[in-house]
């Protein structure tokens, strides 16, 4: 399928590179034109669209990777006049399920299809084409796009109707908050007990409490280094979406609420662009 991508940020750029390497990418658009030009320098014959509407006019499959609900709505509004029937839009962003429902209806009115398909795996997953994709929307549309999407994702799971992908991603983000809290708190305790932290990470990683976050972030956080894989500010944004969804379901999320408060403190201290493992700053003795 002739494929285009909108959004070339920390996730979108490596996604675009893998689509190009697999022979799928025909067109790209990014709000910052210089980034699109940098992609074109890597990709040879890639067309840089002058607008989302121009990209929509020539692509059968459109991937979107943006930061927030408002960005997605703006891009969809811009594309609607030139969307052709049968076009499939795959949004890999993390937005609210309500926004996914709304834009899916707008796209369907043009005879096209919208899949909310947020991803997990962070920047490393995007760079290694090892993302996990959770998809809401029409199952048949997903099957049409699946071969292309496998260029960027190692696992693609259809979760149900429109909005289900974003609901599943909310589950992921809530769980990530709890893991971050547990790992940073445990390592702070280990430090207070004057244990060798490298050895703590080694031994715990091999047991029942071992997890991806400890294995991939432990070594850097104990050296007070927090290069962004998943930025504090972005997880804060995602958890705010989760809390809103939970409030509507009358479900308390105490760990999520605590994490929102901690992230707010980090952001106010100037650490919003650091990795979420920077939570260790607030925990260590």
Predicted regions and their residues:
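Interdomain hinge/lid region at the active-site interface
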Residues: 162, 210-275, 285
